[in-house]
Regions:
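WD40-repeat beta-propeller superdomains and closely related acidic/aromatic-rich repeat-like regions
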Residues: 1-449
Length: 449
């Protein structure tokens, strides 16, 4: 039988397909269970929930210092006309996409590729970074800047030291860790407002670059190439995505189709690139010549997408379906020959009474899948389902149990796995009740006593 956390309890971890719970949120139960096996405790990180953080206005700031009044007025008029035209075309091609954003599994929490450092969106304009390797500092670091408004997505840079990209209104903030005697350097030629320092003790974080999006668009999708050289970004307001050469600060726009973009995912090997749109289409690209193959869905638009670690298989969730889809590549890169196979999550319907899949995350080992879902019966509402995954020619899943968050009526806002945690899958969840909790999923024989 799948493990079910009783109402009022909180989940602590998995031990060999058994999801352990406690009566309240504290480190004591963690020390009694997984800490003996892992040698560390991942304490929950409290944060102020989004609803109580005031949002900044949407109007872009126009720099006019050093210009004459006539030139400044002309620039204002041109800018206003451009804004009117942009808004007109966006209302035609991307009418309600901003209202659909909450249905998409935006990356609101991200683990550093090689460190025990987690970052997550903690408010409309701020990000929290918690370094579990820093034993001297128990407090998280808060990243804020006047340039960082209306944060939607974040992603750690692979092979880039401690460097974090944050998608927000008007562009992408690039943060880097600074140390005494070794301060992070701002990109040559970048804007003068850069160099903002983070708040909090311990490691200081510096805003080293701001990559401006076309027409001040809201960045709502980010994905790094595995080597950390290129960063892909997109907006629900636009049908094109941009590939940034981050070292140069230069972006190249690429467009296919008309719909606004909901999601971008670079494959772990870098050979393929996935782009999904709100009109129900999605594109598979091979990155050798940047050739694409269009796909369309009859089950709504893609709300979740995750690659397997080999980059030869992908799981998709759709807005109008209780069934996942798995993409299997039939040949080696750069071939785009692939087929889509359904993956049934039978228990989601029979046990929870859910109305649809919300978000998904697949750990790098390929053995654990986390799924959140819409609605559900009272006792199942707001839980995360954890599945055991088996990969052969086709993907098969079996339900292990459910994770319940802390507080009253908790709901998962965002979640992600640590891709390189050696002792097993490590799932972090940001809950609507204002806690980011981390759950070790331990089942390997060489760890268990």
């Amino acid at each position: 039988m799948p493990s079910f956390p009783q109402p009022g309890s909180v989940t602590i971890c998995e031990i060999n397909r058994d999801l352990i719970t406690a009566d309240n949120l504290s480190d004591d139960r963690a020390k009694e269970t997984y800490a003996k096996l892992l040698g560390m405790v991942f304490s929950p990180v409290p944060f102020q929930s989004d609803e109580v953080v005031s949002r900044s206005p949407d109007e872009p700031e126009i720099e006019q210092q050093g210009r004459g009044n006539g030139e400044a007025e002309a620039l204002s008029l041109v800018s206003a006309l451009r804004g009117i035209l942009n808004n007109y075309f966006k209302s035609i091609f991307h009418p309600n996409h901003v209202n659909l954003l909450p249905e998409v599994g935006l990356q609101g929490v991200s683990w550093h590729q090689h460190k025990h450092i987690v970052a997550f969106i903690s408010g409309a304009n701020q990000v929290i970074v918690r370094d579990y390797e820093d034993s001297e500092c128990k407090d998280p670091c808060i990243l804020t800047s006047d340039s960082q408004r209306d944060v939607k997505v974040l992603d750690w840079r692979p092979n880039g030291g401690k460097s974090l990209s944050v998608g927000c209104k008007g562009g992408i903030c690039i943060w880097a860790a600074s140390y005494p005697g070794n301060a992070a350097s701002v990109r040559s030629g970048a804007a003068s407002f850069l160099g903002t320092l983070s708040r909090g003790s311990g490691t200081r974080w510096t805003l080293v670059d701001f990559l401006r999006s076309p027409d001040g668009e809201q960045i709502s999708a980010l994905s790094w190439s595995p080597d950390g050289r290129y960063l892909a970004s997109a907006s629900y307001e636009s049908s094109s995505f941009t590939i940034w050469d981050v070292a140069q600060g230069l972006g190249t726009p690429i467009r296919r189709g008309l719909g606004g973009i909901s999601m971008l995912k670079w494959s772990p090997t870098g050979d393929y690139f996935f782009a999904a749109k709100f009109d129900g289409t999605f594109y598979l690209w091979e990155t050798n010549t940047w050739t694409s193959e269009p796909w369309s869905s009859t089950s709504g638009f893609v709300t979740g997408a995750t690659w397997d670690t080999d980059g030869r298989m992908m799981l998709l969730a759709f807005s109008g379906s209780l069934t996942l889809g798995s993409i299997h590549f039939a040949s080696k890169p750069p071939s785009l020959d692939a087929h889509l196979v359904p993956v049934d999550l039978l228990e989601i319907v029979s046990l929870t009474g859910s109305q649809g899949i919300e978000k998904i995350a697949w750990d790098a080992s390929g053995e654990r899948l986390a799924v959140s879902y819409k609605g559900g019966d009272d006792i199942y509402n707001g839980l995360i389902a954890i599945y055991d995954v088996r990969r052969a020619q086709l993907i098969s899943v079996s339900l292990i149990g459910f994770i319940r968050g802390p507080g009253d009526n908790p709901k998962p806002v965002a979640f992600a796995f640590h891709d390189k945690f050696k002792q097993g899958p490590l799932l972090s969840v940001c809950w609507s009740t204002g806690f980011c909790c981390t759950y070790p999923l331990i089942f390997r024989s060489h760890i268990l006593p």
